[in-house]
Amino acid sequence: VVFLLTFVVALFSLRLLSLNQEKDERLRAVYAAESTISRVSSQLNCYLAESDFIKKYIESGHVLREEEFAAISSNMQDGSSVIKTHELAKDGVVSQVYPVAGNEAAIGLDMLHNPARKKEANLAKNSGMYTIAGPFELVQGGTGALLFDPIYTYSKKGERSFWGFSILVLQWDNFIEEVELDKMEDAGYRYQIWKKDPYTGEKIVIAESEEDFPGNALEVACSVPNDTWYFEIIPKA
């Protein structure tokens, strides 16, 4: 009887230890996921801060000439080459681009009606919050994401009206490198970040570790403006 009781207590202790270890591992994984998403959001906010001068300039009622736009945008180009292009879209239609060379195909693109862009563009317009579209193939070539930042102007009566967008086109591979997702693998995790296609609801993989990803990972839902990103994470075997 004493042996049986000791055996039961030992099993219970092992099970309790296992549950505590699983809980600790889950908490560490959740923290790693949320910290990574926070780092992504912080980096996006840095890019937006760089374009904020142009946004405020337009909101104050000034007309931005081509040479002024080019001069300001040239100073926004970051050393890591994440910002591929800066675009202004008056009434949602791309009217100014920097640099022009290599990005001519983007001029005249109607973001509010383009089949691959309109969902996120209209979300940004209607909510007043910046919205990320992509990653996807860009009309000017390469893979990137669009950061729609809506601009509004006010009449003398204080009535607000939609002016258009300040749009940052991000080189996606450079952006992923900039936010240091490889640190997840260095910390001993495999991961996959994905979101739902706004048109089909299908899964779009935003980034993932190089190793094959299993189906029994912990999933953490993280909010970004006008969207939800899903972070699946699991310790390496």
Where are these regions (language model features)?
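Alpha-helical transmembrane segments and their helix-membrane boundary motifs
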Residues: V1-F3
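Membrane-interface helix-start motif
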Residues: I234-A237
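Intrinsically disordered, low-complexity polar/acidic regions
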Residues: R26, V30, E59-Y230
